A protein has these predicted regions:
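N-terminal alpha-helical "arm" segments
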Residues: 1-55, 236
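OB-fold (S1/OB) nucleic-acid-binding surfaces
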Residues: 117-125, 130, 199-223
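Long, hydrophobic alpha/beta structural blocks
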Residues: 48-194
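Single-stranded nucleic-acid-binding OB-fold domains
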Residues: 184-191, 197-210, 248
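Short, Lys/Arg- and Gly-enriched loop/turn segments at beta-strand edges
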Residues: 242-250
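Beta-strand secondary-structure signal
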Residues: 195-197, 215-217, 238-240
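Short nucleic-acid-contacting surface segments enriched for D/E, G, S/T with interspersed K/R
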Residues: 143-150, 224-240
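Short, isolated positions in well-ordered beta-strands
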Residues: 3-4, 95, 127, 223
Length: 250
């Protein structure tokens, strides 16, 4: 698994001894991630690494933060392909999440619901996604709280999919729907179901990861897959939602 590690249970934007706006990561809050196929997620994004250690060893330090809220160190790298990765370290253990910065920006809101997951709202869509700078997001919950308003770049990485006849665009996040019913962030995960008609396909080479990936345009939403698909095909995919924010903009 690429997404592993520990966080300070009382780390905040004002220092690790404060308690407001805390980032927490007890075992039950990260269990959902370990159940997901994170190796498949990274390989589909073109990161051809054997494990976390190899990824961290190869990660450039062009964006290197020390003492980020909840973490001892944060590394961020934006690949020319549009793919990016955020690596976060606490007490010698690392976690990493990918993001895709090649899609179109859209106005939206996002808040942090768990250490790595943000709840994104843009247009008519509301879904949980892996966030590229979770430590910079305001803590919120399903019944209220602060949200960060700005430009977001959502994307979905397909873990499995089927192609067929053209379809209307839909995106559903069953875990987010449950979250707003039971108010339990421990059950939240970034897995989504998406369907639509492929409006365009572009091949990309991940220079850092040495792998290739394809981006399908589904009504403006980038759907990342590991092989070439045909324009005009309908697709139904189960995948993981990502969200790039303005935090890392130059």
């Amino acid at each position: 698994m690429f997404l592993t590690g520990k966080l300070n249970s009382e780390a905040t934007t004002r220092g690790k001894d404060a308690t407001a706006n805390a980032i927490t990561a007890p075992a039950e809050k990260t269990a959902a991630f370990r159940m997901a196929n994170m190796d498949k997620l990274f390989s589909t994004c073109g990161f051809d690494f054997a494990d976390m250690e190899e990824l961290i060893a190869e990660l450039p330090t062009d964006h290197d933060m020390w003492e980020a809220p909840g973490f001892d160190r944060v590394l961020f790298h934006a690949d020319p392909s549009g793919m990016a990765v955020t690596a976060m370290e606490y007490e010698g253990e690392w976690a990493a999440v990918p993001s895709y910065r090649g899609g179109e920006e859209a106005p939206g809101t996002i808040y942090r619901a768990t250490p790595y997951i943000g709840i994104v709202e843009t247009g008519d869509l509301q879904f949980a996604a892996l966030a590229d700078a979770p430590f910079a997001l305001p803590a919120g919950n399903s019944v209220g709280g602060e949200k960060l308003r700005g430009q977001v770049r959502p994307a979905v990485v397909a873990l499995k999919y089927e192609v067929g006849e053209p379809e209307e665009f839909t995106l559903t996040s069953p875990a987010t729907e449950r979250f707003y019913r039971n108010f339990k962030p421990s059950m939240l995960n970034p897995q989504v179901e998406v369907a639509g008609t492929i409006g365009g396909v572009a091949k990309h080479s991940n220079e850092l990861g040495m792998g290739e990936f394809w981006v399908c345009d589904l009504d403006g939403l980038p759907l990342i897959v590991n092989e070439k698909l045909e324009v005009g095909q309908g697709i139904r995919a189960h995948g993981i939602a990502l969200c790039a924010t303005e935090f890392w903009d130059d």
